[in-house]
Structure formats: structure tokens, C-alpha cells
């Protein structure tokens, strides 16, 4: 039976409820028959039924020994628990003063509050307002997995606390062992509502060595952005030497922020990188300005400017993309600061468009300004023709389909056909930037019209699409052509018929049930010959010869060139799809073009008299979950040799394990092999280790390209990663080709403190951009592993 309590004054109702629950649980245990499972009371960190909004939660105290005086105090000893809303307090002894709402707890005191846990020897706490003092506690924050210790923690309210002589880390606690990294501070303040921490007199230690000291250091308690200094950026390359920069992040408003990074390069001098981002109701964008005044190596100031903006007004949308740099060698010396995929050709592009859907079709109106900066350099052999600028481009495009009344009257072969058509009218003013080569033809004006009418027929397993299209253009040039003309025009009609089928059957492949398809396709094209040698070429370029382009009616992109094709493309694709998973397991394809007459308007300007084009073959396989492979081959049947080929294979047996190999060949141009990987090489992965240690595992990651033709490495990156669970170290070497005999070699070092920040150059981005299937080692851990704006 429960031990009788001393005779005291009547206790408050919550205390009596706790005592009654204790006695009821013990009585049930005594009365339960031996053959039945006894009912048990189980502890919980929160009350099962939360208080209603506006209601004050009940305060419940339970203990092995409990005494109470009504409306004055309650004293407990031996496994004491105090529950109040989201608060659960455990201690060896507890003295609760009712009037003051003050709890004094001693001996193995443990607080659980909103998922956070605090443990220490002595606590004084005003319960309802969660205000008090905890002596020499340790703590754990549930939102981030971070933990620490302090001499004293002052609870200001339920969302704010201040720790004297405190520490913070995301490494798991190990008895008698310092964490691999931690922040120690004279005073540590935490705003749990805003998810941010502030360390005054802070020192960041890594493996016991101080690596950063600051009068004040802010850090995140979640993935939300906040103002403050970020860990430094560290770079080392052969052109600029050692670079050290310290970013400051300014969280201006929820929809605006900025980052300023003063830096120093040992070879070049001092500079400043800046970025401003905004997200407004009508528009969003980013502005980057990078400055290097008085470059000691180059002899002049260097800069770059990047503008990105998207927005709209009414039915109209606009898009701005612009990148400019100070000089032709900027892309070599400051490659990290150039974003363009073509670093020697920088665009400034402003597009304005309107999309309007009507009952009979769609009208697209648009206007564009496009200018270029070409970084030619002094090497004449590496210089290239500059694309023409559009100043401006204005057009309208109408797309429509005939209504049902028209369709009912048009029934070839007894089937209803769907008439559709489009018309594009456009004006362009073309000119050349100042960096254009002297031999390039000057600009001019062009008006063109592109139109087509088609009558698609088909069913579930076939289609037949006859199509008539017209490409008409008129020119007014700034300088006369070779024949003396400045004004000229031409009209190019084209007839095409696209016909295909889809046949399916049940099949088996390597013992697996499959659904196999056979998809033959024919494309007939007839475009008459028009002499285009004396016409300007402002925007046309040859299309790559592949499975997509062979099924088009023009071998050129743009408007100015139209190939005089009279040809039939014949091909077929077969697919095997798993009936169980619905995934494509195998795909095989072949296609070839047959010419009915010689072709004179060609990509290389040489007439084509060969009746059969090169044969294109393609295959892709995913026969097993861990393996992927694909390849394409362009084969010349007349010479019996391959013209181009690409072979690729990838093996990914599990997380953080990927290996890919590629071979690329273009006859008389290039032959290259590529190896990319991410692979564990030593140690036990974090997911398989005990959580009581930060023991590590080594990984290797990288991509290496080797030119068999030139017998040298081209653009490559290779390095190692060490994952200790609560921190990740990455270091590697990146090699970029910047000319026929020039390279830029960069050493990268990055320390990622999981739950805090990344220290060093962004090796992570380099690996993600270069390694197919790369996965960040800490991706399954703290939500704020990257404290980067």
C-alpha cells in the first residue's frame, strides 16, 4: 500500500491529482491477475492533453515522497517530476513555492522544454514565465542537435537564455573528452524563437586549436538567414597567390539581403566583393559587383558586374541578364568570379514578352535587346568571330488551331484532321560590338516571316503529319555585299511529312517481364534550292547532327540559312519497360537520312553528293539498379569508320558511392576520356557508427579529363573528403585550361562544421558541378550545415 502522508493542511487540487494518480497506478499493479498484462503509467515529456488557448496549464508534481501545504508550498524527494505545459522538470529534490511560483531543484536536475534538454546540479526557476538560473548545466537543442555547457544559464523567458562562460558544438557529447569543434564565449546568448545565437568574446576551436577569435560572433540555430560575420574564404592559385576574405551578411529584410566580402590577394592587393538580392511582389533579382582597385600584377583596376532580374507588369513579363568585366584577361585571372558558361563571351540580354491566350489560339508578343562583350585577348590564333547584337529584336507570334466546324468538313481517309498553324513576324537590327574582328561583315536590318500549316492525323499508335512551311526574309544592309547589293530578299518554302507508329508486345529480358515497343519513324522533307551565298548570315549556325536534328526540316538554327533538303529520314527505336516497376530498362535506336538529290546549302559549304548520310546508333541500358550505361555512334558507311562517338557508364551501389567513365571521340578533332567519382576509401560511414564519437571516414571525389589527342590533362578537379560526423574537411586541386598552353591551377580547402558553417573556398560547389551523382556528405544531418546566404 502507498506510504501514508504526514498530516498537513489541505493541498492544492493539482497536487492531489498527482497523488491520486500515483496511488491508482500502484493499486492497479497489485490487483492485476498474474495471467493478464498489468496496466502501466508511462512518463512523457509533455502532457497528453495540451491546454486550450488562453487557459493556464495545470501544474502537476509527483515524487516518491511528497508533502504539501495548501496555497503555500510543496516539497518532494526521490524521483521528483514537475509538469507544466511543455515543461517537464526532474530532480532528486524539489521545493515549490506556490505564491512566488518558484521551484528550487537540486541533485540530477533535468529540464525538457520545447524539445530542448538542460541538465545540472541546481536550478531555481519561476515556472509559469520560465525565468530562472541553472548552475553548471549542460544542454541539448533539439532543433539543431547542438549542445554545450556553461557556468551559469539564466533563463530570461521561454525563448531566450544567456549562458555565462558557455560553449556550443554539434559534436556528440563524450565523457571526459572535448568535442572536435566548439565555440567558447564569455557570454552566450540564444534566441530560440529567432533561431540565432550570439557569442561575446568568442573563440572557435577546432581539434583544440583556436582558428577564429572575435569580439562578437553570431551563429544560426536553424537554416534561417541572419546578419553577421561569416567564416573566411580561403583560396590559393598560381595567378593570384593566397586569397583571404571575410564575408559580412546583412539580412536587410525578409525579402532583401546583401553580402560584402573584403579580401586580400597576396599578389594583387585589396578588393571587395558584394552581392545584393531582393524578392519583391513584382520582381526578383540579384546584383553582384566585384572590385579590385590597383591590381599590382595587371597594373590597372579590375572589376566585374552581374545583373539578374525577373519581373512583370500586367500581362507583360521581363527578364534581364547582364555580365560585364573590366578587361580581356579577367576570365583567366578571376575565373571564380565569372559565371557565364562561355567565359570569353559575356551577354547583356533584356527580354520583354506577353503571352495571351484567346479562344482561337495564342498570341506571343516580344521585344529584346542583346549585346555582347567578347574577351578576345592578344593571341590571334585564339580569337573568334563575335555574334551579332540585336538592337532591337521586335516580334509577334500567332499560333492557332481550326475549330470543330472546319474540322468536320475536312476528313481525309474518312478521319477527322486537326488543322493547326503559326505565323511569326519579326524585325531585327543587327550590329557588331567594338571588340569584333576587322574581317567580320557589318550589320544591317532584317524583317522575316515564318509560317506553317499542318494537318495532323493519328490514333493511339500512329501519327501522320503533313506540313507546309515558309521562311521569308528581307534585308537592308549597312554595307554592300560582294555583288554590290545592299537590299535583298528571299522566300523559302518547305514541304514535310512526319509519319510514325508505335507497336507493343509482352516480352522477357533476362528473366524479367517487360513491355517491348517498336517505334519506326519517317520524315520526308522537300525544300527547293535557293542561292544563299550572297545573303548575310546574322543568326544561323549548323545544328549538331543527332537523333533530334535529323528529324527536323532544316540543318540550321536561326533564320538566315535554310538547307535545300530533299530527303527521307528513316529510323526506329525499341524500348523495354519493366512491367513491375514501370521503368525503362533498355532502349535501342537507329536512324539514317537518304538524299534524293545533291545538297548545296550545307553547314561546311561543301556540296553533299553522297545519297546516304552517316548512320546514327544509340543505346541506353539500366539493366540493374546500380548500373547505367548509354552511348551514341555516328558511322560513315562509305568509309567504314566512325565519325563521332560517346560512350558512358555509371556505377552507383549506394549513398556516397558513384563512379562514372566516359569516352568521347570526334574524328580529326578530339579524343578524350573522363573519369568522375565519389567513393569511400577508409573508415566507417557516419550512418554505421556509434553516435558517441566523431570518428571519421575518408572519401575521394573528383573528375579527371585526359586528351588522348594532345596527350595532356584538360579541365580536372580531384581531392579528398574526411567526414567526422560533426565536421567535414574537403581539399583538392582544380586545373582549368585558359589557353593552348595556359592553365590556372587552384588549391581548395574547405572545413564544414556541421550545424554551424563552412570555412574556406566553396569546394562543395566545385564537386557538385563536376561529379555526376555527387552527394554532399552532411546532407542527411543538421538542417543548417551551410550557413551561407
Model-identified regions with their sequence ranges:
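Gram-negative bacterial Sec-dependent N-terminal signal peptides
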Residues: 2-28
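N-terminal targeting/secretion presequences
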Residues: 2-7, 30-31, 35-49, 55, ...
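Generic N-terminal simple sequence motifs
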Residues: 6-10, 29, 34, 211, ...
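Outer-membrane beta-barrel proteins and related beta-barrel translocases across Gram-negative bacteria
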Residues: 116-135, 139-183, 191-789
Amino acid at each position: 500500500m502507498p506510504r501514508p502522508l504526514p498530516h498537513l493542511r489541505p493541498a492544492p487540487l493539482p497536487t492531489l491529482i498527482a497523488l491520486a494518480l500515483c496511488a491508482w497506478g500502484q493499486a492497479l499493479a497489485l490487483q492485476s491477475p498474474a495471467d493478464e498484462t498489468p496496466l502501466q503509467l508511462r512518463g512523457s515529456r509533455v502532457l497528453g492533453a495540451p491546454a486550450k488557448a488562453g487557459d493556464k496549464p495545470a501544474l502537476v508534481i509527483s515524487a516518491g515522497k511528497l508533502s504539501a501545504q495548501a496555497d503555500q508550498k510543496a516539497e518532494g524527494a526521490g524521483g521528483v517530476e514537475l509538469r507544466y505545459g511543455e515543461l517537464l522538470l526532474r530532480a532528486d529534490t524539489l521545493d515549490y513555492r506556490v505564491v512566488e511560483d518558484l521551484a528550487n531543484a537540486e541533485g540530477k536536475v533535468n529540464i525538457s522544454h520545447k524539445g530542448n534538454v538542460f541538465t545540472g546540479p541546481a536550478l531555481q526557476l519561476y515556472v509559469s514565465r520560465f525565468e530562472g538560473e541553472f548552475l553548471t548545466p549542460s544542454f541539448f537543442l533539439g532543433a539543431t542537435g547542438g549542445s554545450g555547457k556553461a557556468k551559469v544559464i539564466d533563463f530570461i523567458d521561454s525563448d531566450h537564455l544567456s549562458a555565462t562562460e558557455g560553449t556550443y558544438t554539434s559534436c556528440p557529447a563524450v565523457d571526459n573528452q572535448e568535442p572536435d569543434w566548439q565555440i567558447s564565449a564569455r557570454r552566450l546568448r540564444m534566441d530560440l524563437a529567432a533561431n540565432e545565437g550570439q557569442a561575446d568574446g568568442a573563440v572557435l576551436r577546432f581539434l583544440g586549436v583556436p582558428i577564429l577569435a572575435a569580439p562578437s560572433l553570431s551563429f544560426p540555430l536553424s537554416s534561417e538567414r541572419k546578419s553577421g560575420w561569416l567564416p573566411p574564404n580561403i583560396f590559393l592559385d598560381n595567378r593570384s597567390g593566397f586569397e583571404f576574405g571575410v564575408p559580412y551578411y546583412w539580412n536587410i529584410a525578409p525579402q532583401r539581403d546583401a553580402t560584402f566580402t573584403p579580401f586580400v590577394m597576396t599578389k594583387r592587393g585589396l578588393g571587395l566583393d558584394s552581392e545584393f538580392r531582393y524578392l519583391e511582389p513584382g520582381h526578383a533579382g540579384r546584383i553582384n559587383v566585384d572590385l579590385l582597385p590597383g591590381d599590382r600584377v595587371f597594373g590597372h583596376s579590375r572589376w566585374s558586374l552581374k545583373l539578374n532580374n525577373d519581373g512583370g507588369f500586367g500581362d507583360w513579363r521581363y527578364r534581364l541578364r547582364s555580365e560585364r568585366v573590366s578587361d580581356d584577361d579577367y576570365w583567366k585571372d578571376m575565373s571564380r568570379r565569372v559565371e557565364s558558361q562561355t567565359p570569353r563571351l559575356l551577354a547583356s540580354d533584356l527580354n520583354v514578352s506577353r503571352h495571351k491566350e484567346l479562344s482561337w489560339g495564342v498570341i506571343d508578343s516580344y521585344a529584346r535587346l542583346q549585346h555582347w562583350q567578347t574577351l578576345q585577348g592578344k593571341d590571334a590564333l585564339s580569337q573568334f568571330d563575335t555574334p551579332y547584337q540585336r538592337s532591337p529584336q521586335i516580334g509577334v507570334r500567332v499560333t492557332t488551331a481550326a475549330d470543330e466546324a472546319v474540322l468536320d468538313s475536312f476528313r481525309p481517309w474518312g478521319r477527322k484532321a486537326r488543322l493547326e498553324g503559326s505565323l511569326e513576324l519579326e524585325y531585327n537590327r543587327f550590329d557588331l560590338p567594338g571588340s569584333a574582328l576587322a574581317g567580320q561583315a557589318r550589320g544591317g536590318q532584317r524583317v522575316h516571316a515564318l509560317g506553317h500549316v499542318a494537318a495532323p492525323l493519328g490514333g493511339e499508335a500512329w501519327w501522320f503529319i503533313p506540313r507546309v512551311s515558309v521562311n521569308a526574309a528581307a534585308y537592308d544592309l549597312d554595307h554592300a555585299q560582294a555583288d554590290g547589293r545592299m537590299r535583298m530578299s528571299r522566300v523559302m518554302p518547305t514541304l514535310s511529312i512526319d509519319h510514325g507508329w508505335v507497336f507493343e508486345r509482352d516480352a522477357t529480358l533476362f528473366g524479367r517481364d517487360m513491355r517491348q515497343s517498336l517505334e519506326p519513324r519517317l520524315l520526308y522533307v522537300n525544300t527547293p534550292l535557293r542561292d544563299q551565298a550572297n545573303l548575310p548570315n546574322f543568326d544561323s549556325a549548323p545544328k549538331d547532327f543527332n537523333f533530334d536534328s535529323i528529324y527536323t526540316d532544316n540543318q540550321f538554327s536561326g533564320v538566315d540559312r535554310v538547307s535545300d533538303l530533299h530527303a527521307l529520314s528513316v529510323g526506329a527505336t525499341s524500348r523495354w519497360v519493366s512491367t513491375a516497376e514501370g521503368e525503362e530498362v533498355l532502349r535501342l535506336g537507329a536512324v539514317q537520312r537518304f538524299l534524293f538529290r545533291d545538297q548545296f546549302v550545307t553547314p561546311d559549304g561543301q556540296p553533299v553528293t553522297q545519297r546516304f548520310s552517316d548512320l546514327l546508333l544509340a543505346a541506353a541500358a539500366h539493366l540493374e539498379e546500380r548500373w547505367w550505361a548509354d552511348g551514341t555512334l555516328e558511322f560513315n558507311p562509305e568509309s567504314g569508320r566512325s565519325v563521332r562517338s560517346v560512350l558512358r557508364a555509371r556505377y552507383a551501389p549506394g549513398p556516397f558511392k558513384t563512379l562514372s567513365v566516359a569516352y568521347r571521340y570526334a574524328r580529326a578533332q578530339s579524343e578524350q576520356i573522363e573519369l568522375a567519382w565519389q567513393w569511400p576509401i577508409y573508415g566507417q560511414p557516419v550512418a554505421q557508427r556509434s553516435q558517441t564519437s566523431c570518428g571519421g571516414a575518408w572519401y575521394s571525389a573528383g573528375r579527371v579529363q585526359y586528351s588522348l589527342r594532345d596527350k595532356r590533362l584538360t579541365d580536372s578537379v580531384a581531392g579528398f573528403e574526411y567526414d567526422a560526423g560533426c565536421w567535414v574537411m574537403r581539399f583538392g586541386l582544380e586545373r582549368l585550361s585558359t589557353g593552348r598552353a595556359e592553365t590556372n591551377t587552384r588549391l581548395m580547402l574547405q572545413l564544414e562544421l556541421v550545424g554551424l558553417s563552412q570555412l574556406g573556398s566553396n569546394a562543395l560547389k566545385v564537386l557538385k558541378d563536376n561529379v555526376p551523382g555527387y552527394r554532399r556528405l552532411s546532407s542527411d544531418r543538421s538542417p543548417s550545415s551551410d550557413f551561407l546566404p
